[in-house]
Amino acid sequence: MSPPAAVSPPARSAELASAPAVKLPVGLSKNSAAATTVEEMEGKWDDFKFAPIRESQVSRAMTRRYFQDLDNYAESDIVIVGAGSCGLSTRYILGKKRPDLKIAIIEASVSPGGGAWLGGQLFSAMVMRKPADAFLREVGVPYEDEGNYVVVKHAALFTSTIMSKVLQLPNCKLFNATCVEDLITRPSKEGVRISGVVTNWTLVSMHHDDQSCMDPNTINAPLVISTTGHDAPMGAFCVKRLVSMGRIEKLGGMRGLDMNVAEDAIVKGTREIVPGLIVGGMELSEVDGANRMGPTFGAMVLSGLKAAEEALKVIDIRQKQNSF
């Protein structure tokens, strides 16, 4: 392979220049008590000591904030189901365009990111076809330019970057290790309107067959964006639920791998499937019978952008409908 034709800017220089110094917990010894930077702690480890804490303080610090989030996001403006590359890209754009919207992200896995921590066959590099490189520049991920496509040296670099930006957004909460077990519905002239999600701990959901009395929780939202990936134990969940509800006759069935056909189809097809439910990413392939694209990630990112665009078109209407 020829060397890369060009290399993108690794990050916006202004962002790097303005990054604040990292602050660590201050110790209590005479050498570490006044330390406010890493450099001030170096070489003084013999007398180092952390600030004291009681175990209940740790418990309350976690519990108080989590239950405040549960209370706050019980009524959300948008719920994104799935925190893979499509879902995270959707959240990033929504945060940029409408920072006022309160958005919960529900991720079944302990670790967000979906399949975007590695490239194909557990390899490191991530390939994106142009013009998805525009989003990499937007979030500050460096890449090698190979002409019609670009290569990020490790997929985890993209995923960790977009995740860090999303989690710093206002009005954003990620509930990981949490899965969507069902959809909240309301009657409408179209048959049904989606108005929220039914949630549970993922570990609880995995044991419904051998345990009982494990009812779920709920989040009301006028708009749900589902990006759970192709058919799998937790994948394509929302569209599979639409089939069992009778809102979709059957799944289209994902077709064989064709990168050129698949990526265009996924981005163009990202839309509101039924009122209140937008579907993007590989979950859409199960609705439309689209081809799979394999280890190229541009469609996931740009489907996220289009999902955000579709959401902004209908959110005001769906909010007015969501009064009960």
Curated annotation (Swiss-Prot):
Gene3D superfamilies: 6.10.250.2840, FAD/NAD(P)-binding domain. During the catalytic reaction, a sulfide is transferred from Cys-213 to a reaction intermediate, generating a dehydroalanine residue. Its EC number is 2.4.2.60. This is Thiamine thiazole synthase. The lineage of its organism: Eukaryota, Fungi, Dikarya, Ascomycota, Pezizomycotina. Its cofactor is Fe cation. Substrate binds at residues 86, 107-108, 115, 180, 215, 230, 282, 292-294. HAMAP family: THI4 (MF_03158). It comes from Fusarium solani subsp. phaseoli. It is found in: Cytoplasm; Nucleus. GO terms for cellular component: cytosol; nucleus.
